[in-house]
Amino acid sequence: MDKSKRPFRKSKRSFRRRLPPIGSGDRIDYRNMSLISRFISEQGKILSRRVNRLTLKQQRLITIAIKQARILSSLPFLNNEKQFERTESIPRATGPRTRNK
């Protein structure tokens, strides 16, 4: 059978294995803010294990470290640094309010 007759055969592509996000020398600790901040989203949420590419044990340790840092106020619970641009303000009607019944 020649190669043109194999419709379901996928070509083999070489892939490069990604490096783990936590090296062997990195210590997972609530004081290591440079490490912890890599696993938090823009809103301040803990990213999932699938996104982080961590092992189960590493994800558990990261989660505990983030929660400890939040309790000790070295990390905010929410990151609400949203920048709103103010456009022209619309004047409100200052008359009496009417209720819709």
Curated annotation (Swiss-Prot):
Protein name, as recorded: Small ribosomal subunit protein bS18c
HAMAP family per UniProt: Ribosomal_bS18 (MF_00270)
Chain intervals with Basic residues compositional bias: 1-19
Localisation: Plastid, Chloroplast
Region Disordered, residue ranges: 1-23
Keyword Chloroplast: yes
GO molecular function, a single term: structural constituent of ribosome
Biological-process GO terms, alphabetical: translation
Organism: Ceratophyllum demersum (Rigid hornwort)
Pfam families xref list: Ribosomal_S18
Similarity section: Belongs to the bacterial ribosomal protein bS18 family.
GO CC annotations, alphabetized: chloroplast; mitochondrial small ribosomal subunit
Keywords, alphabetical: Chloroplast, Plastid, Ribonucleoprotein, Ribosomal protein, RNA-binding, rRNA-binding
Main localisation: plastid
Subunit relationships: Part of the 30S ribosomal subunit.
